[in-house]
Curated annotation (Swiss-Prot):
Signal peptide: none annotated. Expressed in spleen, prostate, testis and uterus. Residues 1-28, 60-82 are annotated as: Disordered. This is Uncharacterized protein C1orf21. It comes from Homo sapiens (Human). InterPro entries: DUF4612 (IPR027967). The modification Phosphoserine is found at S95, S115. Keywords: Phosphoprotein. The gene is C1orf21. Pfam families: DUF4612.
């Protein structure tokens, strides 16, 4: 019995088969349905200036409405639900407190000996 791979005959593609393979790789074998088509004018593309004017007018109305509602909100001193309350239940560990104390001390003292060695010019 022989090796199964020895029974395979290696063939060289002819030019037609080679071109067919390249077409598959390049996507050229797909029909016209996948090619780029010209843009057709549709209903929403017609009367573009009129539609743009309507949209601009609608946007302006919405801006005026939102501006007037913002003025009303600002006149009220305190709006419930919109003011963020500080977190009362925030837990800070002792190591975090110690770290921030040390950081505050370093800031108060100014530059340390390591930063004095660096020449900043």
């Amino acid at each position: 019995m022989g090796c199964a791979s020895a029974k395979h005959v290696a063939t060289v593609q002819n030019e037609e088969e080679a071109q067919k393979g390249k077409n598959y790789q390049n996507g050229d074998v797909f029909g016209d349905e996948y090619r780029i088509k010209p843009v057709e004018e549709v209903k929403y593309m017609k009367n573009g200036a009129e539609e743009e004017q309507k949209i601009a007018a609608r946007n302006q109305e919405n801006l005026e409405k939102s501006a007037s509602s913002n003025v009303r909100l600002k006149t009220n001193k305190e709006v419930p639900g919109l003011v963020h309350q500080p977190r009362a239940n925030m837990h800070i560990s002792e190591s975090q407190q110690e770290f921030f104390r040390m950081l505050d001390e370093k800031i108060e003292k100014g530059r340390d000996y390591c930063s004095e060695e660096e020449d900043i010019t």
